[in-house]
Swiss-Prot record:
Cofactor note: Mg(2+). Can also accept Mn(2+).
The protein's Enzyme Commission number: 2.7.2.1
Domain of life: Bacteria
Listed PROSITE patterns: ACETATE_KINASE_1, ACETATE_KINASE_2
Annotated compartments: Cytoplasm
Site feature: Transition state stabilizer: H178, R239
Lipid biosynthesis found in the keyword field: no
Listed Gene3D superfamilies: 3.30.420.40
SUPFAM superfamilies xref list: Actin-like ATPase domain
This protein's pathway: Metabolic intermediate biosynthesis; acetyl-CoA biosynthesis; acetyl-CoA from acetate: step 1/2
Protein name in the entry: Acetate kinase
Main function: Catalyzes the formation of acetyl phosphate from acetate and ATP. Can also catalyze the reverse reaction.
KW Aminoacyl-tRNA synthetase (keyword) present: no
Protein source organism: Shouchella clausii (strain KSM-K16) (Alkalihalobacillus clausii)
Length: 395
């Protein structure tokens, strides 16, 4: 039994899971928050118990030391030698990385080179990698990229209709995100359908505060809704999704905002929050809509209709559809959104069973009996995907 740590490092946080492989069982999981600030918070859950500790954690290396000390101190692992691999989530791999990869100095340099494509995330991911390298220098580490799964997209999907030299010189193209999640749920769908993934055309809907749709044909991503950044595509919690690019100078002119301020508005004050004016949380919006709040109802309509359009579009891209998968916070838990997204698609063989659809947070087939297209709710598990890739590349 191999023990693998899956890591997701943020600028002031470190999310972790210790997994037993190949069983894929979680031994411990937790989070370090407020790294570099006063009163950092360390939370760990193991053996059915949760422990919380508040102390100053100056940097990610200190967070890693505290985590490892806690794992051994509580007897969760007998010694650090039990850890056979570390898998790091890295948001952006650019065109350089089309698969997960064992981290070497050269790889780390490559991740740093593409950091300008994800300035908010990659530097934090790199900090996490370096922190573990400092504390566990002899344990192999693997980088698992959110963008890698979408590197199979053809040029017809990833190129923008801009001067071609922008792509050649600056790497301006569609990259797509949530790749680790889309990969996990589409492979899981194939298992549940007892059909080789090579034979399937799957539409994957990762719907959380960030949301993206992927067309996965034969196990490969051939198109996805997010673009050069995670701002593109469908309406999200606080992100606008696709808009007319000419709106940016227009908004600047009307509001007096700078380009940076407009981009911040598109990222943090738009989407469901922008339309409702009160929340980016779908649960709040559904509750308000039930009580007759018109803007909440409009927000739900906009959110669902943007996703609905991709179902038809990507079914056309794949030459048909065998399954639709819903995952992430909203996809797994909101029967209302699933129903709205799938409404009126029976002409395509997509027919949701309203009774079966009344499911939250667990695997379930929710299509009507005999419907040609399977509709499946699958809770995502990016950590398991990270651990699988770590084992695949280090064993």
């Amino acid at each position: 039994m191999a023990k693998i740590i899956a890591i997701n490092a943020g600028s002031s946080s470190l999310k972790f899971q210790l997994l037993a492989m190949p069983e894929e069982t979680v031994i411990a999981k937790g989070l370090v928050e407020r790294i570099g600030l006063k009163k950092s918070i360390f939370t760990i859950e193991a053996n059915g118990q949760q422990h919380e500790l508040t102390e100053d954690i100056p940097d990610h290396a200190a967070a890693v030391k505290l985590l490892l000390k806690d794992l051994t101190g509580r007897g969760i692992i007998a010694s650090l030698e039990e850890i056979e691999g570390i898998g790091h989530r890295v948001v952006h791999g650019g065109e350089k990385f089309n698969d997960s990869v064992v981290i070497t100095d050269e790889v780390l340099q490559g991740i740093e080179e593409v950091s300008e494509l994800a300035p908010l995330h990659n530097p934090a991911n790199i900090t996490g990698i370096k922190a573990f390298k400092e504390v566990l220098p002899n344990v192999p580490a693997v980088a698992v990229f959110d963008t890698a799964f979408h590197q199979t997209m053809p040029e017809s999907a990833f190129l923008y209709s801009l001067p071609y030299e922008y792509y050649e010189k600056y790497g301006i193209r569609k990259y797509g995100f949530h790749g680790t999640s889309h990969k996990y749920v589409t492979h899981r769908a194939a298992e549940l359908m007892e059909t080789p993934i090579e034979e399937l055309r799957i539409l994957s809907c990762h719907l959380g505060n960030g949301a993206s749709i992927a067309a996965v044909k034969g196990g490969k991503s051939i198109d996805t809704s997010m673009g050069f950044t995670p701002l593109a595509g469908v309406t999200m919690g606080t992100r606008s999704g696709n808009i007319d690019p000419a709106l940016i100078p227009y908004i600047m002119e009307k509001t007096g905002q700078s380009v940076e301020e407009v981009v911040a508005t598109l990222n943090k004050k738009s989407g469901l929050l922008g339309i409702t004016g009160f929340s980016s949380d779908l649960r709040d919006i559904e509750a308000a809509a039930k009580e007759g709040d018109e803007r909440a109802q409009v927000a739900l309509d906009v959110f669902a209709s943007r996703i609905h359009k991709y179902v038809g579009s990507y079914a056309a891209r794949m030459g048909g559809l065998d399954a639709i998968v819903f995952t992430a916070g909203i996809g797994e838990n909101s029967a209302t959104i699933r129903e709205r997204v799938l409404k009126g698609l029976s002409f395509m063989g997509v027919d949701v069973d309203l009774e079966k659809n009344n499911v939250r947070g667990k695997e379930a087939f929710i299509e009507k009996a005999g419907a040609p297209v399977k509709i499946i709710v699958i809770p995502t598990n990016e950590e398991v995907m990270i651990a699988r890739d770590t084992v695949r590349l280090t064993s």
